[in-house]
Regions:
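ATP-dependent carboxylate-amine ligase
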Residues: 1-46, 50-57, 68-73, 91-94, ...
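Phosphate-binding loop of NTP-binding sites
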Residues: 4, 27-30, 51, 64-68, ...
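Histidine-centered active-site/metal-ligand motif
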Residues: 12, 33, 61, 120-121, ...
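Short, hydrophobic beta-strand segments that form beta-sheet elements in well-ordered domains
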Residues: 35-39, 58, 73-75, 141-143, ...
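Glycine/charged-rich beta-loop-alpha catalytic/anionic-binding loops adjacent to active sites
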Residues: 112-114, 250, 266
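Short coil-to-beta-strand transition motifs
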Residues: 252-255
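Single conserved hydrophobic/aromatic residue that forms the stacking wall/gate
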Residues: 259-278
Length: 278
């Protein structure tokens, strides 16, 4: 059986209530697969979204949750060795995969992949980018680390040729310690900012920079990187890129400069900012 085919499968998500994992479970159910999962921390908004999509969530991690045996288990990155379901999956030799790898093979591969990265602002930027493509009638697929109010969901399959993903630098799974964004086949990428974060998996800012440098090397020469031109840490990792770069920000090195515009004389004063090509 080809576990990465679109043939209907019985798929079990261990650690289903994470934002990305719950979103992927919904996408897989919408593709016609039989989906259920388990978690210990079951709380809104993702548990509500799963319930709305009629996806059963078992409370707690138990070997009995895996009976009858599923065709495939998706293991969330919060689960590690010693977890009862992880140990059962290994003992029973069940096929398993990470959330990021499944997302890549079922939804991103074959599409034009746009990935939003950086320490802060990923969810907001991904939501805005998806909405821009939506209003341009591009019908993008997307995976956002939160529920976007404009869409009423955190994820959607692509009807058009684009898939937009929030690219997290956190690790993929206990069996794959690479950052999740390595899986997303980036062709065009936004890099918002870069500073030390995730001290539970990174020992220093230099380790985070290394992960971003490696990720930038995955972007083809025909791709594009839009990066914060004011962030010194971002500028440091951009040296690893082999793709065209557009810098945005306030400073002189930026190709797109942010200009603040204020019109206080209007009956209703407005203040906004726009990017202008130099």
């Amino acid at each position: 059986m080809n576990l990465l085919s679109d043939s209907p499968l019985k798929i079990y998500f261990s650690g289903i209530c994470g934002t990305a994992t719950a979103s992927l479970a919904i996408l897989m159910k919408n593709r016609g697969h039989e989906v259920q999962g388990s978690d210990e921390n079951i709380y809104p908004p993702m548990c509500d979204l799963l319930e709305q999509n009629q996806i059963r969530v078992d409370s707690g991690f138990h070997q009995s949750n895996l009976e009858p045996k599923p065709d495939l288990v998706v293991i969330g990155n919060a689960l590690s060795r010693g977890n009862p379901e992880v140990e059962a999956i290994l003992d029973l030799k069940l096929p398993y995969i990470s959330m990021a790898e499944l997302l890549k093979e079922h939804f991103i591969r074959g599409k034009k992949s746009l990935v939003v990265t950086g320490t802060h602002g990923k969810t907001t930027t991904t939501s805005m980018l998806a909405w821009v493509f939506e209003t341009a009638a591009k019908n993008p697929g997307f995976m956002i680390g939160g529920i976007a109010e404009n869409f009423g969901t955190s994820c959607r399959d692509a009807k058009g040729s684009f898939f937009i993903t929030e690219g997290d630098e956190y690790d993929t799974a206990f069996f794959d310690k690479r950052s999740k964004f390595f899986h997303y086949l980036p062709e065009q990428l936004i890099l918002n900012n870069l500073e030390f974060d995730h001290a539970d998996i990174f020992n220093s800012l230099d380790e985070i920079k290394k992960a971003f440098r490696l990720m930038l090397r995955l972007i083809p020469k025909s791709g594009l990187i839009a990066a914060n031109g004011d962030d010194l840490n971002v500028q440091a990792v951009l040296r690893a890129a082999n793709s065209p770069i557009i810098r945005f920000g306030f400073g002189e090195p930026c190709d797109l400069s942010l200009i603040h515009i204020s019109e206080p004389t209007r009956r209703t004063p407005i203040s906004y900012a726009v990017f202008c090509l130099k």
